[in-house]
Amino acid sequence: MSNYSTNGSRKIRISNSDDDSRETRFSIQPRNSHKTKEERYRDKEKERDHERHHDRERRDDRYRKVDSRDHRDRNRRSPAGSRTYCRDEPDRRRNNHSDRNRRDRSSERDRDNRSSKSKTKSPDSLRSKSSRKSQTPNHLPDDGKLFDRILDPNYKKKEKTVMEVEDVEMSPVEMLDEEEVSTFTFDDACGPVRPSNEPEEKDYKSEGDPESRPATPKTPLTPDYLENTIVSLNETLSDDEDKGPDDKYGKTPDKEQWESMTENEQKLHRDAMKKRREQRHREAVSKLPVYYPGLRGCQHISEYVILNVIAEGTYGEVFRGKNTRTDEVVALKRFKMEKEKEGFPITALREINMLLKAGAHENIVNVKEILVGSTKTEVYMAMEYVEHDVKSLIDKMRSRNQRFKTGQQKTLMSQLLSGIEHMHKLWILHRDLKTSNLLISHSGILKIADFGLAREYGEARDIEKRMKLTPIVVTLWYRSPELLLEPKTYSTPVDMWSIGCIMAEFIMMKPMFQGDSEPNQVHQIFQMMGTPTEQIWPDIKELKVWNMVEFPPVKPGQLRRIFKGEKLVNETGFDLLNGMLCLNPANRLTASEALQHDWFSEHPKAVPPEDLPVYPAKSELNAAPPENRRKNRLEALLADEEPERAALLRQFNVKAEQLKPSGFQLRG
């Protein structure tokens, strides 16, 4: 008979039996039986520790004696009265101390190894006879167990029980047998469920036969208000019932049908056509690929080859590059990432946003795409390439003692005002208009560039409700007087003042106000335009600097004396210039008003853009003008030539004055 008891992961079997031959019996010795041996072992360990400590002290004493003897001998060898200091002495003592510590650690490690070996017992077959005799009572041989049974007087009175300890891994929780799940039921109402008293639905071979299908059963989950809407599977809807109110107007009627309809029917037809058009639009949009904004979908800069550097500014540097696939030449602007830990530069975000919002306009530079490099700090913007900037063109003409003609001035100003008018209608301020930010192509098209300071503005009449914009904008020479006097807010007149300065530069071939500081710039403006008063500029008292500084009074009239006295512009042109350089921003001309000015309609007319002066661009490495422009000039020169002679000149692409007569003639 056997009894099993479970204790954690061990199972102990206790059996009652009288058969001693099949069972191995042993007695469990009391816990204090090997106490004497443990005490003896501890005493020996203490003695060994004491000996080790004594040996260590003797070794240290010997080292100290050697050190003192060496020191004494060194002092004897040194001259009398001289005190020397050996730099190597502290190092040698430190090394001796480290050697002693290393020897102590090695001795302790050897002692630990001996103790660990004493704990791990080897099998009886590998032990010596002496070690077998000195083994603990827990490892007594079978003969010892037999003697214990003989010498024990109470052995016969004890129960003949045998304890067998087996390592059996058993789960503390009783596991259930696996059962196949045949059916299950949802507790929540997630759909129509067959009632428990309803028989299972049979398979019907002919699915198309409506008579072989059973009627739709009612379920407890069907609400009362939906029972009337359930249609049996056996029923079929008629064509008239199947058509909804919109399906009746799903087809566009003919002209005769349309005329015969009433107004209500025509209205329903219009609504149906509108719904169909919106549905087609939604379907077309749904078929488009999903657009994921951000830099992750941008092309790599390796798609372009950088040809040369064009310029470097405050917020980035510009390169001339070529697309390796299309061979298109573009301008690549690399944004500066000086504080990349703070995120993408706000100036770069504004420039990209404003250029995209401005859209496609002939007089605004067009953005093609955003490119990324190998690192997060390499972000480029690909724009259309324009050969010149207006400032370099003016410098080139001034070095050759040339000026813009009146017709050329009108062409440049009309293009500039057209681009600014488009921006202001979209509520965009450029805030950095100057000749170096105006580009001009070989074909004479002017384009506004560098939107790094551009920003949207509001239309609120109340000055407190407008956006608070920073006054530190616009290059100093083109900055309006209200910006120099620190206003609370500003709007489109700041751009119009810059355009007035640019127009004066087109006429004079140099900047008009060249101040070296803000106070000096204000002084030059007031010397040219006169010191303003509260009568001509009522809102000037709200400017911060005006209330802090007292400006000397200057009478206006210097602007007229310069431009009219030197006959740089006629009266109509001066009126336009004076309207854009008005001190009071409320009375300053807008872009639309300037475009409608009489100066553009009077003689001389604006010349075509192709007739503007063009020079080889530095950004093109002194490349020649395009071929088609040379052909247009050649055609103009050949207009007065004879047809045969013109055809010959056109064939060889030469001018008439380049031909030299010769004495060769054909005899008839």
UniProtKB/Swiss-Prot annotation:
The active site is at 432 (proton acceptor). It catalyses: L-seryl-[protein] + ATP = O-phospho-L-seryl-[protein] + ADP + H(+); L-threonyl-[protein] + ATP = O-phospho-L-threonyl-[protein] + ADP + H(+). It holds the Pfam family Pkinase. One of its GO terms (biological process) is positive regulation of embryonic development. GO terms for molecular function: ATP binding; cyclin-dependent protein serine/threonine kinase activity; protein serine kinase activity; protein serine/threonine kinase activity. InterPro entries: CDK, Kinase-like_dom_sf, Prot_kinase_dom, Ser/Thr_kinase_AS. Disulfide bonds: none annotated. Its main location: nucleus. This is Cyclin-dependent kinase 11.2. It comes from Caenorhabditis elegans. The gene is cdk-11.2.
